[in-house]
Amino acid sequence: GLGLRTSSSLFYLSSMFYLPFIKYFTFQITPVLILGFANLVLIIKIYNDLNSKRYNFITIYNLLVFIFINIFFYRISEHGTDKSAQILILILISEILLMVNFKVIIEKSITKLFVLIGLIIAFKAFYILYGLLFIVIIYHLFQIKKNFSNVLKILIKNYFFLSFIFLIILLLFHNFLITGCLIYPVPISCFDNNLWAIKINEVKDLNNWYEQWAKGGAGPNFRVEDPILYI
């Protein structure tokens, strides 16, 4: 099995719902909370836009996301670590679009982004690649402030930014100690010359399997005949 290679904070959170008598029957509370949170956020956003008659493309986006997650993500038992993180990614995109295209309170908006990106990465370590969206945030801030030192001050003064950086460092260090890779299973981030490191061929095989699964080339009861060609 994969063991601790693909750990997620969702596992630890779900373990809190292992209660006497009820036992593991409340494990699904965690994805219910995530889906409920997303629905609440989207409903509030859509309602505020409609109530103030400020219709724009973000309103349409939020409405489409609301419909999408309730049609395709309604089966709570299938969430795992992927779908809960994907729901938050859709919310994150909405917040980034809002910050980039409209006048908002920068400090408040940045805090939301750091919290969302932090949760996404904590839920699914592989999604640390979405941390690249941080570049978009810095670029937007630089365009507004026109001064790198001012941008740096805004980031450093934000407590969530420091927590975000600590989370990234901790996650990379954890991945390295467990697998020999900074981002598992991304082969280019691996140092397979270490004694404890997973063999690079095994990392590549798992990376291909993830890609095959993500592109619909495999499922619980089927898989394509030629995975490499399919990918």
Describe the predicted segments one by one.
Residues 73, 110-136, 166, 180:
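Membrane-interface alpha helices of multi-pass inner-membrane proteins
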Residues 1-23, 223-231:
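Short hydrophobic/aromatic helix or loop-helix immediately within or flanking a transmembrane segment
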Residues 51-52, 89-109:
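Membrane-interface transmembrane helices that cradle and orient dolichyl/undecaprenyl
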Residues 29-54:
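Transmembrane-helix motifs of polytopic, lipid-linked glycan transferases
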